[in-house]
Amino acid sequence: MSFRVDGDAGHELEIIDNVSLRVDDGEFVVVTGPNGGGKSTLARLIMGIEQPTEGVILFNGRDITHLSVTERARLGIGYAFQQPPRFKGLTVRKLLSLAHGSTLPEDVCCNYLTEVGLCSKDYLNRELDSSLSGGEVKRIEIATLMARNPGLAIFDEPEAGIDLWSFAMLVDTFKKMHDKGENSIMIISHQERIMMLADRILVIDHGRVRTDGSRGAVLPTLLGEFACECDFREAAK
């Protein structure tokens, strides 16, 4: 699959360059790599927010390349944005029920919020408006995706805007989701603690797959690269 956009002087920019990716049932895949390498674009292509210039996207054997975001969501693909939208007039409790497809009991809604580090009594009846911080909205969206329980759950940098305590709870939540084996999980992240949960790690660099392998094969090399980069920065001070 490839994705290009118009650049300067009529030249096309290759954002995703002939990338092939397979996520098996129940598999946990982390996509990582340098900033601007194409990771988030890959996730947006899978969700249907962007359309590939070339190639096809299959979900459970069905060609979904030209399906809309809504149609893909109905088939069982869920997506948590880096910067989630706000819905003035809609309460958190109502949003969770809408995501689930039916009215959820209060205790179930509370459990979803607790799992993402939010005090349920403080948030259950709040509206998704400008009174919520970016980090709060981010956590609510992740809880919403959990309530939907999609076949493929895509999280785009879920750690963004979240404090360390809440992040620890999120990591535990992702582990529980994976242990259940009900969902395939794809997370865009640089975080070692998230990569430690992965079955497989995919490294995207300049729109291409640089590395694709098991956590045991890929993570030690990545950590070595990070250590070298930190040593270089320290020496340059």
Report the location of each language-model feature:
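Helix-to-loop junction immediately C-terminal to a conserved catalytic motif
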Residues: M47
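ABC ATPase NBD coupling module
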Residues: D63-G78, L222
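ABC ATPase C-loop
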Residues: L145-M146
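Conserved ABC transporter NBD signature motif
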Residues: G55-R62, V108
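The feature captures the beta-strand-to-loop junction immediately N-terminal to the Walker
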Residues: T32-P34
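Q-loop/switch helix immediately C-terminal to the Walker
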Residues: Q83, G89-P105
